[in-house]
UniProtKB/Swiss-Prot annotation:
GO terms for cellular component: peroxisome. Induction: By 2-thiouric acid. Repressed by ammonium. The active site is at residue 1295. Disulfide bonds: none annotated. [2Fe-2S] cluster 2 binds at residues 142, 145, 177, 179. This is Xanthine dehydrogenase. Binds 1 Mo-molybdopterin (Mo-MPT) cofactor per subunit. It comes from Emericella nidulans (strain FGSC A4 / ATCC 38163 / CBS 112.46 / NRRL 194 / M139).
Amino acid sequence: MAPGVLLQPSQSELEAASPPKAAASLLQLTEEWDDTIRFYLNGTKVILDSVDPEITLLEYLRGIGLTGTKLGCAEGGCGACTVVVSQINPTTKKLYHASINACIAPLVAVDGKHVITVEGIGNVKNPHAIQQRLAIGNGSQCGFCTPGIVMSLYALLRNDPKPSEHAVEEAFDGNLCRCTGYRPILDAAQSFTSPIGCGKARANGGSGCCMEEQKGTNGCCKGSSEETTEDVKHKFASPDFIEYKPDTELIFPPSLWKHELRPLAFGNKRKKWYRPVTVQQLLEIKSIHPDAKLIGGSTETQIEIKFKQMRYGASVYLGDLAELRQFAFHDNYLEIGANISLTDLESVCDQAIERYGSARGQPFAAIKKQLRYFAGRQIRNVASPAGNLATASPISDLNPVFVATNTTLVARSLDKETEIPMTQFFRGYRSTALPPDAIISSLRIPTASEKGEYLRAYKQSKRKDDDIAIVNAALRVSLSSSNDVTSVSLVFGGMAPLTVSARNAEAFLTGKKFTDPATLEGTMGALEQDFNLKFGVPGGMATYRKSLALGFFYRFYHDVLSQIEARSSDLDNSVVAEIERAISTGEKDNEASAAYQQRVLGRAGPHLSALKQATGEAQYTDDIPAQKNELYGCMVLSTKAHAKLLSVNTEAALEIPGVIDYVDHKDLPSPRANWWGAPNCDEVFFAVDKVTTAGQPIGMILANTAKAAEEGARAVKVEYEELPVILSIEEAIEAQSFFERFRYIKNGDPESAFRDADHVFEGVSRMGGQEHFYLETQACVAIPKAEDGEMEIWSSTQNPTETQSYVAQVTGVAANKIVSRVKRLGGGFGGKETRSVQLAGICATAAAKVRRPVRCMLNRDEDIATSGQRHPFYCKWKVGVTREGKLLALDADVYANGGHTQDLSGAVVERSLSHIDNVYRFPNIYVRGRICKTNTVSNTAFRGFGGPQGLFFAESIISEVADHLDLQVEQLRILNMYEPGDMTHFNQELKDWHVPLMYDQVLQESEYFERRKAVEEYNRTHKWSKRGMAIIPTKFGISFTALFLNQAGALVHIYHDGSVLVAHGGVEMGQGLHTKMTMIAAEALGVPLSDVFISETATNTVANTSSTAASASSDLNGYAIYNACTQLNERLKPYREKMPNATLKDLAHAAYFDRVNLSAQGYYRTPDIGYTWGENKGQMFFYFTQGVTAAEVEIDTLTGDWTPLRADIKMDVGRTINPSIDYGQIEGAYIQGQGLFTTEESLWHRTTGQIFTKGPGNYKIPGFRDIPQIFNVSLLKDVEWENLRTIQRSRGVGEPPLFMGSAAFFAIRDALKAARKEWGVTDVLSLVSPATPERIRVSCADPIIERARVKAEEGEKSFFVAI
């Protein structure tokens, strides 16, 4: 959306933006101020007059055609929008290149700066070294996140051309990627490094070396992680790196060195923007207009505007006020300007520690530690302490430190300066003691005493990097020479509506002898009184939060004790150390495909679009240039989970300037046209008289701009009559709320087997859902044509044909009038298989009504609210075994939360039942599956499609049986593992069965049992830190379970010049499908890979396509292309015989003049499959992809924090078509699976039924530093695949590795067993997935967690619901 250029605002407009008196006075104050911003963009000067202050930098960039910068979340949490802003740093007076989030940066804030986007540093013809190395290093799959990652690395290199490995490892803490698993990105980035020093992060003033606490079983990380650039090059199949030449970078424009900042004032009816250049000007504004919103980095303000619908009539930008960004060292305190950036504050803290020494510098070490995990680098580059203080967030990481250190806040107004002790600053929730007309000018942070004072800061969150705190704390104590407590501050965030001191605990501690054991116990008891949380406390997690408060103090107490009485018998030294990470590394077996490499097939190579993606030139749906007369759509969504629709009033919305129309069910050709769904047509595009889930579309507002459309949608007034709501599986079971579809598999005689079993064990296993979190949200452009009702649909969909069918339905024409096109997706993972149809249908309805193009790209919160997730599952099981552990029988009821409609839930449940055996033989089995009908968004396909849920239940059963029998779980797996030729419980023979072989290989290659002995020794000597291991096998059936979908078509053209154009039915969504298909065609036709091209996927070139899903697309489309190429080769055979040395150009030329058809339509359908439910007959899958993974983790049992130490993955992918692509799929799937089973927790508001976790702020996919510290991947080799009848004898690899991520979960469970055993608890642990830090902590059985447990009172329920 291009920003509007406004005329100079009139006085009436200004009065609308400010109170009347303030407006008049402000006009008088600012009448001489400038209304023009001047900046440079990619080296070119830009001058803009009277800019709309509501426009973000991202909107401006995309509006002028620089679409390489992407919108991923609109809240600064994913990094897809990262650009670099270069300026003379007001604090250091040096040039600094800051990576920032363009999605939350106001355009008007870049005055006097140089903005650099991904387009500005290189292109496909002349790429930057970063872009080229990332591309050939396989660091880009779907590519939507890639420009942001490129720019984060670019910022690092511009500031430090030879960064350390540690700096590179941490450079991406503000970026997310959903595809790659991060390893290849880090490998490419590390090629720029100069390795020095140990890679461990510093904490609490320590040196940071991993050997300091003797924690590493493998020695210092420095010894294992240092690599030269040459070493890094060997990680890639093609090490032809472009040389990095820092002296050829874009220069900082000379005119900006002498750019003189001028005060700015401009705006419109809605908003006025001021940029003072002196503090005096700022104070004058505040005196006239105390309610003016002060903006430093805009990191919080933009979110308030976007998601909380806050409106600020007047904003004052402080980012360029040098006076507020200075610092000064004094004898006993450091004074910092309150608007200093957090990045600069990190550097200042380093200087302070060096100046004051480690003892007196403890406050600055504490601040620096909190900053290390404070948001991402892009946020820290612009955010400030003043912003933290003014917003008064109860979970701010810095505020507890300021309170605990007795920092003084200096507030200035026009007529006075006020000193406010931080202990008195916070008054209530988001309320402070700051006078309305004052600004936070500076902070005076006292140094600690040279002796006797101890300060530590702590934080626990769901994910280590870029995550808000669950609980944080700053704990300080001052001791006399006799160790009596003379002063104490115990300050916590996340325990109350504001940053709060533990008053009872502080009172108890004061005057006590610190080294007396009774002091610890008494303080813990007092903390229980301070934080007596209720079970239903807002924010939830009552037990966990209480345990963290107690645990932080327990750690602090022993840390201090270790400093003053290192040999005390009361010292629990093992509790002091926190988890640290080494520089991550990994190895791949690059020789795995050597034995069967052909001219093209079997050879490693990058994704063919990788370089376009890295340079920002790859085009996605919303990058398509605006069409003439195009409108933007924004959906009106239900805010109730279950209610009657009483009225929908659009009058106010249609009055908003720029709003054109409203579309709903009345605009469809018939009531029947409103119904959609696959395979059951049980969902409506637009709600009619009732809504059955929050987030259900009611209508769509059309407007000239996205902003106007969003404002219009919010202005639609909907009146409801609420109805009873069912959210969770348990609630659905209790209410018997199920869809009719029921499936079962029965084999053998379970009843008799249970009677004969030595042991019968029963249990319940539960697994949460998972948000797809593709970086590109659902997007669509519907373009009506002038004739015959034709329409062109550009949709971010995995399913062009179904999109075509339903667009035809809602527009009332035949399918031959609709062309559905897809260039590429920014990720899909199943979330765009059916759910993309909803947006396409609504956009098409709107376009048909107004006869104008309609565009819509969902915001992240809208996408999560409407598009569904992986199904949560619940399994109640009973298993019979012999005393030796041989499995005899399994009986299980499996329930899936389908949501408010069925979507693909039936097929998802079917696959879960077929995978509930994993790799184990249950000779007698009866498993049943039901779909729960609830008032949540309809859950849908997600990578694995029910398979991971069934596999998880199998491994949960195996783990619990092993514990019941006190057997080694690794041996129990071997005892019950299928052998070659065995039949599954759905009567399919296991051919080319290699799991036992791979299991043995992984045990040996990972030195599993030797390391397990080391883990046992570690656990024996570490009370509060435990390690665990697991080795998890898998098999995954490849084929659509719906038989008719196992078919594909292709169209291959050979042109006169010998170039080849291929079209097929599959969609490129980052998995490298087009790359593999191009390779197949190039091999078959005997031409170079560069001579073959795939442009797009479209329904007018290949019709009746199956969705790109089920890991079957390479098999299906590959053989269809091969079939077409075979036809062409047969036609060219006579010419090859006549001209054996001719090129394809020569052959095509000759054949054309002989009137030979140089186009061929290929087709393939999977043979010999077709399963009949109920009869348990027929072959369900064409083959099984197999794998084994060994994982090792470390958990902090005091906090629930954890880190993956190592993963060794081996996959059987047959004869790989392209090992680079397959390795990328394996690594990406593993990390996505690790997220599924650990960090990714979806939560719903109990009171409203709306999803709470609807963005990166509170839904945590794994980040760069969540991957295994050692991440090894290999492919099975040196075997024959005698029965594999696929293209190249390759196996599908997209979905199968995802379950391997559960190895981290089961390793955590193993560590928890050790933690519980430490305290004498040996009960069998039934661990719910995901194993979040909360679940890890509350599963421990130590005295601290037991005293922290919060029980629900009668009728009391948890704040959030896990459905």
